[in-house]
Amino acid sequence: MNLRRRGIVVSFHSNMVTVEDEETGERILCKLRGKFRLQNLKIYVGDRVEYTPDETGSGVIENVLHRKNLLTKPHVANVDQVILVVTVKMPETSTYIIDKFLVLAEKNELETVMVINKMDLYDEDDLRKVRELEEIYSGLYPIVKTSAKTGMGIEELKEYLKGKISTMAGLSGVGKSSLLNAINPGLKLRVSEVSEKLQRGRHTTTTAQLLKFDFGGYVVDTPGFANLEINDIEPEELKHYFKEFGDKQCFFSDCNHVDEPECGVKEAVENGEIAESRYENYVKMFYELLGRRKK
C-alpha cells in the first residue's frame, strides 16, 4: 500500500520541515529521510515533495520532485514571479539596486511586478521621482503604485498574486511586510519601523517561509537585501538580462554594447529608446563583473 502523499515545503524549524498537503491543505511537521544527509541533498522552501505520514501526525520526506527553478538569494524553489518593492524615500531605492534585482530575476527566468510603495508619504519632489521610475520601467515591467496605509493599489496587486508562488524582493524598510498585512490581514507579519537616521529597516524575518493567501497563491517573505551579488554571471552574459537590448542590431554579433563601434544599443540610448540610467547601470555592472574575473 502506497501511503506517500504530496505537498509543498512552507517553512523550516531547526532540522524539521513543515509541509502543506496539496490535497487537504493540512500542515505536517516532517523530518528528512536519512539519504538527504548521506547524499548531501538540499531542500528549500517552495519545494514540492513526496512524504509519508505516520501515526503521530508527523511525517517523513521521501523525495523532492522536479524543480522548475531555484533562487539562491534567497533560497526559494518553484517561484512564478518576483514582486519587487521599491520606494523613493525612507529608504530610497536607487535605479542601480532596482536593475540588479531585475538582472537576477531575468537570469532565473522569472516574471517581475514592480511595486512602488509608500505612495501616501510622497511630496511633489518624490512624485517626480515616481514618474521618472515609471518612464524608465513601465514599458518593461508591470508597475503597481501602492500604500499599505491607505489601501491604494492593494486590489490591483492581489490580481497579480492570485494562484501563483511569489517572492518579495526589495531593500529592508520598503514595506514588504506591511504590504502583505494589507493584502491579507490574517498573515499578521511583524512590522518594524524605519530608523529615520539609518533609513533602513531592521529585518523582520529571519528565515524564508511560504505564506498562503486567503484568496489563493503563496508568497515567500524573506529578509530585505542591501547587497545583491551577481558574481556567478559572466560579463558577456549580462546583456541578455536587459530585455530591451535584445532586438537591437549591432555590427558585431557578439557586441557587449560597451566600447564597440556601430552598436545598436548605444544608438538606442542616444535616441531615447533605452533609458540612460539602464544603460549606465549595465555598463557599471559589466565592468564590475569584468574586474572580478580578472582578480
From Swiss-Prot:
What NCBIfam families does this protein map onto? ribosome small subunit-dependent GTPase A
Residues annotated as binding GTP: N117, K118, M119, D120, G170, L171, S172, G173, V174, G175, K176, S177, S178
Q: Where is the CP-type G domain?
A: 68-228
Q: Which PROSITE patterns match?
A: ENGC_GTPASE, G_CP
Q: Which domain of life is it from?
A: Bacteria
Q: Provide the gene name from the record.
A: rsgA
Which Gene3D superfamilies does the entry mention?
Nucleic acid-binding proteins, P-loop containing nucleotide triphosphate hydrolases, Probable gtpase engc, domain 3
Give the EC number(s) under which this enzyme is classified. 3.6.1.-
Subunit structure comment from the entry: Monomer. Associates with 30S ribosomal subunit, binds 16S rRNA.
Look up the record and name the cofactor or cofactors this protein needs: Zn(2+)
- Biological processes annotated in GO: ribosomal small subunit biogenesis
Q: Which SUPFAM superfamilies match?
A: Nucleic acid-binding proteins, P-loop containing nucleoside triphosphate hydrolases
Q: In which compartments does the protein localize?
A: Cytoplasm
One of this protein's Pfam families, by short name?
Answer: RsgA_N
Q: State the protein's purpose.
A: One of several proteins that assist in the late maturation steps of the functional core of the 30S ribosomal subunit. Helps release RbfA from mature subunits. May play a role in the assembly of ribosomal proteins into the subunit. Circularly permuted GTPase that catalyzes slow GTP hydrolysis, GTPase activity is stimulated by the 30S ribosomal subunit.
Q: What is its main location?
A: cytoplasm
The record's listing under PANTHER family reads: SMALL RIBOSOMAL SUBUNIT BIOGENESIS GTPASE RSGA, SMALL RIBOSOMAL SUBUNIT BIOGENESIS GTPASE RSGA 1, MITOCHONDRIAL-RELATED
Q: How is the cofactor bound?
A: Binds 1 zinc ion per subunit.
Q: What is this protein called?
A: Small ribosomal subunit biogenesis GTPase RsgA
Q: Which InterPro entries match?
A: G_CP_dom (IPR030378), NA-bd_OB-fold (IPR012340), P-loop_NTPase (IPR027417), Ribosome_biogen_GTPase_RsgA (IPR004881), RsgA_GTPase_dom (IPR010914), RsgA_N (IPR031944)
Q: Which family does it belong to?
A: Belongs to the TRAFAC class YlqF/YawG GTPase family. RsgA subfamily.
State the Gene Ontology terms under molecular function: GTP binding; GTPase activity; metal ion binding; rRNA binding
Q: Which keywords does the record carry?
A: Cytoplasm, GTP-binding, Hydrolase, Metal-binding, Nucleotide-binding, Ribosome biogenesis, RNA-binding, rRNA-binding, Zinc
Instruction: Indicate the enzyme's highest-level EC class.
Output: hydrolase
UniProt-annotated binding residues for Zn(2+) = C250, C255, H257, C263
Can you name the source organism? Thermotoga maritima (strain ATCC 43589 / DSM 3109 / JCM 10099 / NBRC 100826 / MSB8)
